[in-house]
Structures are given as structure tokens and as C-alpha cells.
A protein has these predicted regions:
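Glycine/charge-rich, flexible interdomain linkers and switch-proximal surface loops
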Residues: 56, 84, 156-158
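Residues at the C-termini of beta-strands that transition into short coil/loop
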Residues: 78-81, 92, 235, 255
């Protein structure tokens, strides 16, 4: 793009949604405020009487509201905050997804294990409300949606009638916020599967520039809290996490995904719960055909 808001002026949306602002892709910006400013450019192309839907829990909420008001947009906030127009009152994980309460809707069940995805669903509900569409049918349809491959899909390897391994495939991409969310959700899931061993497979988060080392090391405390039975890392930055934790957690590091692809089968056994999370460029998704082959082989042998 050559000019600010070039794309949004082509689209001329009636409703613009910003789900989050974080330090994702920060190597292309001077700081996080620049990221917030770049995202706020979507408001510049809004049609007259347009609506800006903004996450009320985000640190850049006030900045985004100010930018939206410059174009006289109607502000619609969504999130956990009490000031939200669409308020999340409860959001909890269970073994099969998430249960959410918002506004006057109680115990709505979604098939998304990742609470960030559930929060994004509430952003969609905010759009529906602004369009003044009936929500009942939409809620029924959304509750049937399943996570996509690489976006929190849950796969099960059945070894026999009593033993299985669960894989949470969040390998499509990662940034600092989504990585922390994935680890937090995995920790909640780990508590629900106490009898299972835990395996965390993480790849580097890319495009973080000079902040890369620090941001990766910020994951150390939550990984200590999860205390997985096995930590596998792919990339030079997650190797630094490995180096910090290898005295207390069983760890193996790989600089390239091709190395782990050759060895992954040796780590897979019954009664595990496994998380895959990393930037797309680290290639963790290349492990999924191996897992799916194991699923098929076991099904054929049953």
C-alpha cells in the first residue's frame, strides 16, 4: 500500500471490527502504538454513520475509540469489561470447548477450546446486533462450528478402547498474545486431563524484531507453571526457552522442523495431551500428516 487506509477506502465498510492490538509483527513498526494506529486506519474508510466495533479489554481501547470518533463512527464495545455493549459475563473451558455467558444469554456452548476464538465470536455477535438481525438462529449455527485445521482443531489418536492421545493443533500461526492464550488454555485443559502426560511443542514467533529474545523468554513462567512432561521447541528463539528450562523440564530443541519430523514418532505414546503452536514459518503444521497417519493406521488395525 502507498497511502494510509488505501484498502479500507476501496471496501468502504459500514462496520469495522478490531478484535485486538498486540505486538504481533512489531519488527515492521517502531512500537505498539504504531500498530494500533495502523489498525485504526480501517475507520478512515467507514461509510457515513458507520460502526466501529472495538475490544473493550484491549490496552489500546481508548486510543481506538478516539480514532473512531474522528470519523464520527458509532462505538460498539465488546469484551469482559462492564462498559461493553456486548458483555462477556463468563467464559470457561471444558474438555469439548468453551462455555460462554454474554448479555442475557446463559451457558452457550462453543466447540472452540481457545478462549480467544470464543471472544472473537462475541465480536461477530456484536456485528449481528448492529445489523439488527435475529440472533437465535445464528447462535445455533455458530455452536455447530468446529475449529479449523491449525486453528485449534482437536484430534484424537485412539490406541485401544481405553487409551488415547489428544492433539490440539494450533500450528497455523502465533504471536505473543495468541501464544500466551494457547498456553493458558492448554494449562486449563491439562487440569481437566490430570491422568494424561502433557507435551508442549512450540515454534518460534516470527517478525518480532529486536524484541524477539525477550518476548520468547516471557513464556518461561507459564511453561514452568504448566510443567509439561516434555517440551519440544523448533527455532533459535524457542531454543533459548529450552536452555532456561532444561534443568527442571525434559526438553529437546530443534533448529529446523525437518529434524523434528524425522523424530516425532518416538515421542508419541498413549494417554498424552499435545499442544502445537508456532508461527507458520516454523512449519509445525508439517507434523500433522504424521499424526493423521497414526490415527488412520490405528483405525485400520482396530
Amino acid at each position: 500500500m502507498l497511502f494510509r487506509s488505501e484498502l479500507t477506502k476501496i471496501a468502504k465498510p459500514n462496520i469495522a471490527v478490531i478484535t485486538n492490538v498486540s505486538n504481533s509483527h512489531i519488527q515492521n513498526f517502531k512500537n505498539e502504538k504504531e500498530i494500533a494506529r495502523a489498525k485504526s486506519e480501517i475507520f478512515l474508510g467507514l461509510e457515513k454513520n458507520g460502526v466501529a466495533i472495538i475490544n473493550s479489554d484491549n490496552d489500546w481501547k481508548e486510543f481506538l475509540i478516539t480514532e473512531a470518533k474522528k470519523v464520527n463512527a458509532k462505538i460498539h464495545l465488546f469484551g469482559h469489561s462492564k462498559i461493553s455493549n456486548t458483555q462477556i459475563k463468563k467464559l470457561v473451558n471444558d474438555k469439548d470447548g468453551s462455555t460462554i455467558c454474554y448479555d442475557k444469554i446463559e451457558n452457550w456452548h462453543l466447540k472452540y477450546l481457545n478462549t480467544t476464538q470464543a471472544e472473537n465470536v462475541i465480536a461477530s455477535i456484536s456485528v449481528i446486533k448492529e445489523l439488527k438481525l435475529p440472533t437465535k438462529k445464528v447462535l445455533t449455527l455458530i455452536s455447530k462450528l468446529k475449529p479449523l485445521s491449525g486453528r485449534g482443531e482437536k484430534l484424537i489418536i485412539n490406541f485401544n478402547s481405553k487409551q488415547k492421545t489428544i492433539i490440539i493443533d494450533d500450528s497455523y500461526n502465533a504471536n505473543p498474545a495468541s501464544m500466551m492464550a494457547a498456553l493458558h488454555n492448554f494449562n486449563n485443559l491439562r487440569i481437566k486431563y490430570r491422568e494424561f502426560e502433557t507435551v508442549v511443542i512450540i515454534g518460534d514467533m516470527l517478525e518480532l524484531g529486536k524484541s524477539s529474545t525477550k518476548i520468547h523468554l516471557d513464556l518461561v513462567p507459564i511453561l514452568k507453571n504448566i510443567n509439561p512432561n516434555l517440551l519440544l521447541t523448533v527455532g533459535k528463539y524457542t531454543k533459548k526457552i529450552n536452555d532456561k528450562l532444561n534443568l527442571t523440564i525434559k526438553c529437546h530443541s530443534y533448529y529446523e522442523i525437518s529434524e523434528l519430523v524425522k523424530e516425532i514418532k518416538q515421542y508419541i505414546k498413549p494417554n498424552q495431551i499435545i499442544l502445537l503452536k508456532g508461527s507458520n514459518g516454523t512449519g509445525l503444521w508439517k507434523l500433522m500428516p504424521i499424526f493423521k497417519n497414526i490415527i488412520q493406521e490405528n483405525a485400520n488395525a482396530a
